[in-house]
Amino acid sequence: MTSFQDLGVSAPILKALDAEGYTAPTPIQTQAIPIVLNGRDLIGLAQTGTGKTAAFALPILDRLAANRKHAGEKACRTLVLAPTRELAAQIGDSFRAYGRFLGLSTAVVFGGASLFKQKQALFRGVDVLVATPGRLLDHVSQRSVRLDKVEILVLDEADHMLDMGFIHDLRKIATLLPKARQSLFFSATMPPPIAELAAQFLNNPERVAVTPPSTTAERVEQAVIHVDQNKKQDLLHALLKDKTISRALVFARTKHGADRVVKKLESAGFEAEAIHGNKSQGQRTRALEAFKKGHARVLVATEIAARGIDVDDVSHVINYDLPNVPEQYVHRIGRTARAARSGVAISFCAPDERAYLRDIEKLTKQTVPVMETDFSLAAPKADERAPRPKGPAGRGPRQQQQRKPQAAKHHASEAHGKAHAKQGHAPSRARDEGDRRDRKGNSVWSNSGAPPKYRKQRKPTR
């Protein structure tokens, strides 16, 4: 069996790995570490939980330690870009843990945290800078960081980093980097169009694919439940009554959708937290900590926000909404069955999501088993719904009244208004709304029901 020492990792890093409890490299580490140590560009494909971070962090730390030099004021030698705050923080922690005996400096910058404190951390220069693209460009615009000294560029979760939402920021950042650099892309999935885009940032890269992106993680029991969209929340409640679901990661398609799911779960008595881009950094950190410590049994997340969630004992992944990109399904269910554990992935499939399910099964080359349940999954048919009230206070159908001609209706309403006024009551606006007119016969009320604002007519000037 290959060891970290066989891969050429230095003694101080071996000591740190031993302290962290690492005994043998994973397949992605075995293949990627020698390539990175040799200074080659790399595209590394591996599912989450396979040790991607160590696959680039270990050789980078070795290279920086072997050629020690000061980066320079406000500069960095290695730049690692990540799509989310959680992933950036996790990568920063990994660099510090693996390099604890090397004396190298690491800084992490992302939105939602103090810009001033980040400027202080960057002022003297750092060996490793981990950043989200938006916050990095904030520092660039304020001249608190410079990128002309970068020797190694890393993009983690490259499939999302190079998605259209990030590509413009990345192109700006690329113009600030020296052309003579080593570039590394690591990701769980890399569809061909994204790979072509990545090639623009890499120079003759090596490609390592330990696990094909279409292969679902081992030890994950998969199931799908066909259910109408408006029954998904009730189905989720029914599933969570099963106490074997000790820690569930639920995927929602939108931020507002995630909040709605959590609100209804809490109303039903379940401990749940949401994590997505609209949450502040403090809220996201607290939600993730509550989930890790077991204070929240359910964490509802969007696709992007889930990147960087590092929790080994997730018992169930629930796709409340099926992803419209099949590779994301593979990435999602890889959040369970980590660290040699087994796990369960359950997907809710509404009628309008069946095409997504077909794409997933086509990609993975396997049929997702249908899970049988006693829960009523279909929306009630028209003749099964509760009867509507027959009339006011349930006293039976209203009497059909013959419609009055419009003119008669107008006079009747006007007469009623005058009689009402004589009794000392203000005219009813709701009753008179269609009948109040000016001298020209135009309605006085606006469409919104509010009276228009009149201006005093000015006398004509001579």
Segments the model singles out, each with a brief description of its role:
Residues I245, S267, K293, V311-D313, ...:
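Arginine-glycine-biased low-complexity disordered regions
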Residues T2-K381:
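Conserved helicase RecA-like core
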